[in-house]
Amino acid sequence: MLSTLPDLHRSFAEQLKLKFQSDSRIHSLLAGGSIIHGGFDQYSDLDFIVVVDPGYYDEVMAQRRELAGTLGHLLHAFTGEHVGEPRLLICLYGPELLHVDLKFVTLEMLTQRVEEPAVLFTRDNTALERQRVKSSAHWPNMTPEWFESRTWIWLHYAVVKLGRGELFEALGMLSFFREQVLG
């Protein structure tokens, strides 16, 4: 699977895998996003799910920025509260820029997932598979009624921004509308 990635991505992913395999606190390393969905290219980011032994979860969460710093030349990292996912660490590595998402979970947390990740390594495949079969991936899709009740307010908001001459805000709202409503 990793062999099909562009050189920069493959090299980073292989290094990350080796690093986490040597850390006894890490139970498994899973890959998601375009690695499993296809369409991966030189501009893609890397999406990883780091399954941590529950006895070390708090420790790893407290040290995750430092841990990310050991994986390469970390330029910056921040957590994913803005997307409703505080377990996510969004990282930018350089000097050749590479965006890497590291989501830290325990085995028990795998029951809530939006995709079926690929296993890059695991210390206990039986435990991992037992947890994965407890539930299936579920994308939190909203009903058409949910979107309909918001559509005109969102479009009005964009029109108001345009009327004020706030062009970037209007473009941002239209982009949001395209992503959330039109898909």
Identify the residue ranges that each predicted region occupies:
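Acidic, glycine- and histidine-enriched catalytic cores of nucleic acid- and nucleotide-handling enzymes
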Residues: 92-128
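Metal-dependent nucleotidyltransferase catalytic core
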Residues: 1-24, 35-37, 50-102
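Short gly/ser/thr-rich secondary-structure transition/capping motifs
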Residues: 31-33
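Conserved nucleotidyltransferase catalytic core and NTase-mimicking acidic/glycine-rich helix/loop elements
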Residues: 136-183
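Short glycine-biased active-site loop of nucleotidyltransferases that positions the nucleotide triphosphate
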Residues: 37-43
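A short, charged helix-loop
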Residues: 116-146
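Hydrophobic C-terminal alpha-helix "anchor/cap" residues
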Residues: 19-21, 29, 177
